């Protein structure tokens, strides 16, 4: 984009601009004609599963292989009797429902019916303790994602409701949950798209005050979205990437937010350039050339952050990034070609009714942002202290942080499957909602052995086990399956923590029963959620480190500085903690959610860091440009004044588009939308205009260390004066101060690096077969760096005659990493997020 020849080729005239616009429209149309519908290739099942190599998935595969017919998806009908004789009412209703589902007119996909009528021996498992409620199990064949399967579930529900009479009846279970999930999502994309378009259009009209200019970003986003969706559908159909309904929803708001941001940046610079260059084609070329570096850095950061998700082993994260990275890459190409070309093609009418002159004058950036810049220049210490204090207060919401793995509680709309699970919880106990499947595989045949019964007896005495169903023998005679009902909510953290001890208890029971070298696996929803939690913990740690590394490298390359990326990344981390704290307080403490969705935290971090750094990139890039003509203090003031309006408008639009996700009836999307809106507003109106300029103002010439601002290029050249007699002494004092400041900077970098190593070591010590060596090494180095840092802070403060406030801020910054490390350790132990070492005496043999 820095090539003038390329810009002249694309934007040299109206005819060339028309060719560019026609090219994109043609590409969008051609791809739409050959690509399948995105909905037809969406995969919503794998996103909620643990890694394929996890124990729970191995257990599921064994159930399908060893128990023929058990791979059907069950619908569970809950019947609760009414009246004085609830037991009789429930029995009559179950008989009528069983008859309707067992006849020749039963719905398609229904394999069989298991109830007290067809299986009276199973009454102990199908009838509640007070006999007022009963269960009817209806295995259904086919894929829950097929429309015919969902229609069959609806028919089962209609028949059950019709034949139940006065009894309370609900259809739940995996089949009911899958059908309700599809219904909750159905139509959501259209509502989301419409709400986003209307909201963005209103904001753009308020910003541009021109209807045609407001339509330009929307048309660009529409073209980019069409191209990205069709390319994504083609790649998903070929099995190259995975696309889910949630990913598609986030793609919509992401492209609207990012696309309008890029459009605002480019068109604002275009209006500003028109003040000096009346030729619109040359002005647009100059605008694109001057914004290319920052916009490309922004897009590259987002794309690389999305690709960083590929290191994840959990399907929910692994398949999330490529599709979004594709969309942002397409949006960046459209922003640099389609948007400038369309603006040129529309000519002077694009600024109607205000005209070019008023549009150009609005780009001067006077008004409130000049006053804010002046405030930061007058009192940088007070401004920085106030912002940091507010962010710390918001971070306190993390005290109520907890995660939720319950899919049904994540629906913000009432569903029949959730009502059914509520009935099961009340009448049969919480564990009956989702039994765990314990699998014991032996090298010997167990058909005639008493071991399976002995193991079942032993399991009834295990912690948190309510009951154990009769063992089922696999067709190979070597594999035994036990349905184990826990006395805990199967979606709670305590239930997830109980899976490990249950496996150990089964291993001990198998050895006591004489089954040597047995392979023990735990399946079911609770075990799957435990494996998902372990995978997410591992993935989140890797993704955090990788995304921070990516952002740091991009900032180093863009700003040619080693120090600036450190304090910019620190502001992003502080913003993330404040955002997550505010989200936890609002959704969990105030709204009463079970917890933060198990994947939401990782999503928030990746998106907030990748998008939040954009505004830092925009203002710091302008700061670098202003340094060519002004000293640092005036340069940061000018950068904030010139970019304040456009970046704030961009942030407002981006926050608004993500806030639209709060209209979706899914907890994860609601929480993610709230968090992103909150975090982007913090970045836009606190961190970017106040905290970052205050830090730059405090650092002065060292803000871009080791780069030093050159002599500003001013029209007048000051006359030289003869050196004074004190010049050698002044130079010596300056050299000593520079060395001290250089040492101060390097020890800050060392402290940050040793802190990162300490966090990694703390995580690794929780993994089996690892030691605490990393914690000891990096802990010692970090402690030494901390002491040296505080000492140098005092020396620098004395040497430069700092005030107490500035000295206190820098000293407190050194205390933040140790405090966060301790908080991390306490939080990890409280929540149990980090994997705990297993206590198995020997490794589990492979099947």
Swiss-Prot record:
Location, primary (coarse class): membrane
Homology family: Belongs to the resistance-nodulation-cell division (RND) (TC 2.A.6) family. MmpL subfamily.
Native source species: Streptomyces coelicolor (strain ATCC BAA-471 / A3(2) / M145)
UniProt topology in membrane: Multi-pass membrane protein
Transmembrane regions: 18-38, 187-207, 215-235, 248-268, 302-322, 326-346, 381-401, 539-559, 562-582, 600-620, 643-663, 672-692, 744-764, 778-798, 808-828
PROSITE patterns: SSD
Subcellular location, record wording: Cell membrane
Taxonomic path: Bacteria, Bacillati, Actinomycetota, Actinomycetes, Kitasatosporales
One GO term describing the cellular component: plasma membrane
Region (Disordered): 708-729
Protein origin, superkingdom: Bacteria
Keywords: Cell membrane, Membrane, Transmembrane, Transmembrane helix
Protein name: Putative membrane protein SCO5905
InterPro entries in the cross-refs: DUF3817_TM, MMPL_dom, Mycobact_MmpL, SSD
Keyword Membrane set for record: yes
């Amino acid at each position: 984009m820095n090539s003038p020849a390329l810009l002249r080729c694309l934007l040299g005239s109206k005819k060339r601009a028309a060719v560019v616009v026609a090219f994109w429209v043609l590409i969008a149309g051609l791809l739409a004609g050959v690509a399948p519908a995105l909905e037809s290739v969406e995969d919503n099942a794998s996103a909620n599963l643990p890694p394929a190599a996890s124990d729970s998935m191995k257990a599921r595969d064994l159930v399908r292989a060893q128990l023929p017919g058990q791979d059907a998806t069950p619908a569970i009908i809950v019947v609760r009797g009414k009246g004085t004789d609830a037991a009789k009412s429930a029995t009559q209703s179950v008989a009528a429902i069983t008859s309707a589902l067992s006849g020749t007119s039963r719905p398609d996909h229904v394999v069989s019916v298991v109830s007290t009528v067809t299986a009276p021996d199973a009454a102990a498992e199908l009838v509640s303790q007070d006999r007022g409620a009963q269960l009817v199990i209806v295995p259904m064949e086919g894929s829950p994602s097929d429309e015919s399967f969902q229609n069959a579930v609806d028919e089962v529900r209609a028949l059950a409701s019709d034949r139940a009479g006065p009894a309370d009846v609900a259809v739940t279970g995996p089949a009911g949950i899958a059908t309700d999930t599809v219904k909750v999502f159905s139509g959501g994309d259209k509502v989301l798209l419409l709400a986003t378009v209307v909201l963005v259009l209103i904001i753009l009209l308020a910003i541009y005050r021109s209807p045609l200019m407001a339509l330009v970003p929307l048309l660009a986003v529409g073209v980019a979205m069409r191209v990205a969706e069709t390319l994504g559908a083609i790649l998903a159909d070929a099995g190259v990437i995975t696309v889910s309904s949630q990913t598609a929803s986030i793609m919509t708001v992401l492209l609207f937010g990012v696309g309008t941001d890029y459009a605002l940046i480019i068109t604002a610079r275009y209006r500003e350039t028109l003040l000096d260059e009346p030729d619109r084609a040359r002005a647009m070329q100059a605008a694109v050339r001057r914004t290319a570096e920052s916009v490309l850095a922004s897009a590259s950061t987002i794309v690389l952050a999305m690709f960083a998700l590929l290191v994840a082993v959990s399907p929910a994260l692994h398949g999330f990034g490529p599709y979004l990275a594709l969309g942002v890459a397409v949006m960046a190409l459209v922003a640099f070609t389609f948007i400038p070309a369309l603006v040129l093609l529309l000519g002077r009418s694009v600024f109607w009714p205000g005209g070019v002159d008023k549009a150009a004058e609005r780009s001067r950036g006077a008004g409130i942002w000049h006053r804010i810049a002046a405030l930061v220049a007058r009192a940088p210490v007070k401004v920085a202290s106030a912002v940091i204090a507010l962010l710390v207060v918001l971070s306190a919401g993390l005290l109520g942080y907890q995660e939720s793995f319950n899919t049904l509680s994540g629906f913000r709309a009432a569903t029949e499957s959730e009502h059914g699970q509520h009935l099961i919880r009340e009448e049969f106990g919480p564990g009956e909602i989702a039994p765990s499947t314990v699998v014991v595989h032996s090298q010997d045949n167990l058909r005639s052995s008493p071991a399976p019964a002995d193991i079942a007896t032993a399991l009834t005495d295990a912690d948190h086990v309510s009951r154990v169903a009769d063992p089922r023998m696999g067709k190979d005679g070597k594999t035994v399956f036990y349905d184990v009902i826990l006395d805990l909510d199967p979606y709670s953290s305590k239930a997830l923590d109980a899976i490990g001890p249950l496996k150990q208890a089964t291993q001990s029971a198998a050895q006591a029963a004489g089954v040597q070298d047995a392979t023990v696996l735990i399946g079911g929803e609770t075990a799957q959620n435990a494996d998902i939690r372990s995978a997410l913990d591992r993935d989140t740690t890797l993704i955090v480190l990788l995304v921070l590394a990516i952002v740091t490298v991009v900032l180093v390359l863009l700003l040619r500085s080693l120090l600036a990326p450190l304090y910019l990344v620190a502001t992003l981390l502080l913003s993330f903690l404040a955002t997550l704290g505010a989200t936890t307080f609002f959704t969990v403490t105030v709204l009463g959610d079970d917890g933060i969705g198990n994947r939401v935290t990782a999503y928030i971090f990746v998106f907030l860091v990748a998008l939040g750094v954009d505004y830092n990139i925009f203002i710091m890039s302008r700061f670098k440009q202003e340094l060519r003509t002004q000293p640092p203090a005036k340069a940061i003031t000018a950068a904030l004044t010139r970019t304040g309006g456009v970046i704030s408008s961009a942030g407002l639009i981006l926050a608004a588009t993500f806030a639209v996700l709060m209209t979706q009836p899914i907890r994860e999307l609601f929480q993610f939308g709230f968090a992103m809106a909150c975090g982007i507003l913090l970045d836009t109106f606190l961190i970017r205009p106040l905290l970052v300029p205050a830090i730059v103002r405090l650092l002065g010439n060292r803000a871009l260390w080791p780069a030093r601002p050159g002599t500003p290029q001013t029209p007048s050249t000051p006359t030289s004066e003869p050196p004074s007699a004190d010049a050698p002494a002044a130079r010596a004092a300056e050299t000593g101060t520079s060395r001290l400041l250089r040492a101060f900077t390097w020890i800050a970098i060392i402290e940050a690096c040793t802190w990162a190593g300490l966090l990694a070591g703390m995580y690794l010590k929780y993994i089996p077969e690892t030691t605490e060596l990393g914690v000891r090494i990096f802990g010692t180095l970090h402690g030494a760096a901390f002491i040296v840092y505080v000492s140098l802070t005092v020396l620098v403060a004395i040497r430069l005659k700092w005030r107490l406030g500035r000295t206190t801020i820098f000293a407190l910054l050194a205390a933040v990493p140790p405090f966060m490390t301790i908080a991390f350790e306490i939080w990890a132990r409280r929540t149990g997020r980090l994997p705990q070492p297993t206590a198995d005496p020997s490794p589990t043999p492979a099947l």
